[in-house]
């Protein structure tokens, strides 16, 4: 963000007469206190709210100041200082007091092509410097081509008003609708990408007017003018160009080309034979024709200043440009929506592909699970069979155990019976033995 001096400009400069005004700017002559140096103070009305159409936005002011601070060329106005207050940004600029070039030429009794090219060469030099820095002026027109001092032997051209100038960045697309309808290029009218080539078209229009005093595309209405520009509807009327050289016409033809890429560049224009050749055979031209051309230029200059208030056409065109800016913003929003839609579609496709891959993996997993399940079922069947067999064997074993138990009980009963019988027999034997013993004893006693 550019920083401007937050001081009262009138503490440093004494303000004088008004030199000119536009839709949102007033230019006043001023004198620096202490040095007595004279400058031009351009008061630019700031836009208070982003949504407002009144005033100039901060971004636009900073862009103009940034460009003016960067450029230093004999044929371009110089920025001296910048102040800011609550309502305005004030540019302290070089004082260009010689008036407009066309007014100066209109005052001349006659005008030769050589004189015209001398001034045009200065315009081309200034534009060449701008284009070397990738800066497009975008508002080249007679009232922005001034003389530093019209009383000098060789008056110096000064290009002024960089309010809509832009840096043309490589790789970035820039579109806008601005400028003065009579001088704008077809790509501006048709809202197409803009570049340095737009300035070259304006130079072609300026040259046409300079040599004829007529405007090539000017219609009865602004819409007719814009239609003529878009269709490149112009010709070299014999009434205006009877004394104009073919080289001059060729120079104009190479500039008034609809396709910007086929239009002559600033470097090519400086190398054009009409600009390079300084001396011409003026004897072949009739002096009265040259006087007539100067008179027509005078008529054009008077008409351009008196037919309507200054910058009215620009104001209307700017309002139209605001509408197109809104349309452009809507188109940009639509493009963003379409881009978002494409991104959503791409995401849906990616999600669908991921889902299909997951489904395929699930199918593969399901097939594996099916195989495992079948294997488990087989194993389970085998286990069930083994369990059934084991149960049957257990039942058989239990049944066998019950039989054995019953046999054991019977054996135990038989054992008990035999034991009782044996015990009785043993007792009998014991009794028998005892009886026999007694008998033996009695027998022995009897013997004695």
UniProtKB/Swiss-Prot annotation:
The keyword Repeat does not apply. The keyword Nucleotide-binding applies. It catalyses: L-seryl-[protein] + ATP = O-phospho-L-seryl-[protein] + ADP + H(+); L-threonyl-[protein] + ATP = O-phospho-L-threonyl-[protein] + ADP + H(+). One of its GO terms (cellular component) is chromosome, centromeric region. Residues 13-275 form the Protein kinase domain. Residues 390-448 are annotated as: Interaction with CDC5L. It is found in: Nucleus; Nucleus, PML body; Cytoplasm, Cytoskeleton, Microtubule organizing center, Centrosome; Chromosome, Centromere. Keywords: Activator, Apoptosis, ATP-binding, Centromere, Chromatin regulator, Chromosome, Cytoplasm, Cytoskeleton, Kinase, Nucleotide-binding, Nucleus, Phosphoprotein, Serine/threonine-protein kinase, Transcription, Transcription regulation, Transferase, Ubl conjugation. The modification Phosphoserine is found at residues 304, 306-307, 313, 321. Residues 422-436 are annotated as: Leucine-zipper. One of its GO terms (biological process) is protein autophosphorylation. CDD domains: STKc_DAPK. Ubiquitinated. Ubiquitination mediated by the UBE2D3 E3 ligase does not lead to proteasomal degradation, but influences promyelocytic leukemia protein nuclear bodies (PML-NBs) formation in the nucleus. It comes from the Eukaryota. Its EC number is 2.7.11.1. Residues 161-204 are annotated as: Activation segment. Transmembrane segments: none annotated. Its cofactor is Mg(2+). InterPro entries: DAPK3_STKc (IPR042870), Kinase-like_dom_sf (IPR011009), Prot_kinase_dom (IPR000719), Protein_kinase_ATP_BS (IPR017441), Ser/Thr_kinase_AS (IPR008271). PANTHER family: DEATH-ASSOCIATED PROTEIN KINASE 3, SERINE/THREONINE-PROTEIN KINASE 17. Homooligomer in its kinase-active form (homotrimers and homodimers are reported); monomeric in its kinase-inactive form. Homodimerization is required for activation segment autophosphorylation. Interacts with DAXX, PAWR, ATF4, NLK, TCF7L2, UBE2D1, UBE2D2, UBE2D3, and CDC5L. Interacts with AR; enhanced by AATF. Interacts with LUZP1; the interaction is likely to occur throughout the cell cycle and reduces the LUZP1-mediated suppression of MYL9 phosphorylation. A species-specific loss of a key phosphorylation site in murine DAPK3 seems to direct it mainly to the nucleus which is proposed to be compensated by the interaction with PAWR to maintain at least the cytoplasmic basic membrane blebbing function in the apoptosis pathway. This is Death-associated protein kinase 3. It comes from Mus musculus (Mouse). The lineage of its organism: Eukaryota, Metazoa, Chordata, Craniata, Vertebrata.
């Amino acid at each position: 963000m550019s920083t401007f001096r937050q001081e009262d400009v009138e503490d440093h400069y004494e303000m004088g007469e008004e030199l000119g005004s536009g839709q949102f700017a007033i230019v006043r002559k001023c004198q620096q206190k202490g040095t007595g140096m004279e400058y031009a103070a351009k008061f630019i009305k700031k836009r208070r709210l982003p949504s407002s159409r009144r005033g100039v936005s901060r971004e636009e002011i900073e862009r103009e100041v940034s460009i003016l601070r960067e450029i230093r060329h004999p044929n371009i106005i110089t920025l001296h200082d910048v102040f800011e207050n609550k309502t305005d940004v004030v540019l302290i600029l070089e004082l260009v007091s010689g008036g407009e070039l066309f007014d100066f030429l209109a005052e001349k009794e006659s005008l030769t092509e050589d004189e015209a090219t001398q001034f045009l060469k200065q315009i081309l030099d200034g534009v060449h410097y701008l284009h070397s820095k990738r800066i497009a002026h975008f508002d080249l027109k007679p009232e922005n081509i001034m003389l530093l001092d019209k009383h000098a032997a060789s008056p110096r051209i000064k290009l002024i008003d960089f309010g809509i100038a832009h840096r043309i960045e490589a790789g970035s697309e820039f579109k806008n609708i601005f400028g003065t309808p009579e001088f704008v290029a077809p790509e501006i009218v048709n809202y197409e990408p803009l570049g340095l080539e737009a300035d070259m078209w304006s130079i072609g229009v300026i040259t046409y007017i300079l040599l004829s005093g007529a405007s090539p595309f000017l219609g009865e209405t602004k819409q007719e003018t814009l239609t003529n520009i878009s269709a490149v509807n112009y010709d070299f009327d014999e009434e205006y160009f009877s004394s104009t050289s073919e080289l001059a016409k060729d120079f104009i033809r190479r500039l008034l080309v609809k396709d910007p890429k086929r239009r002559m560049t600033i470097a090519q224009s400086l190398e054009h034979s009409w600009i390079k050749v300084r001396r011409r055979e003026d004897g072949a031209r009739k002096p009265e024709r040259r006087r007539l051309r100067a008179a027509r230029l005078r008529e054009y200059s008077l008409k351009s200043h008196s037919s309507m208030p200054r910058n009215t056409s620009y104001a209307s065109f700017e309002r139209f440009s605001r509408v197109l800016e809104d349309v452009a913003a809507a188109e940009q929003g639509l493009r963003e929506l379409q881009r978002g839609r494409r991104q959503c579609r791409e995401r849906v496709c990616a999600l669908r592909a991921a889902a299909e891959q997951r489904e395929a993996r699930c199918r593969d997993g399901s097939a594996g699970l099916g195989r495992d399940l079948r294997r488990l079922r087989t194993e389970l069947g085998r286990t069930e069979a083994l369990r059934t067999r084991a149960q049957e064997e257990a039942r058989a074993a239990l049944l066998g155990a019950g039989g054995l138990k019953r046999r054991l009980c019977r054996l135990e009963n038989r054992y008990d019976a035999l034991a009782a019988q044996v015990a009785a027999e043993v007792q009998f034997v014991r009794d028998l033995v005892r009886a026999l013993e007694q008998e033996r004893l009695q027998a022995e006693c009897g013997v004695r």
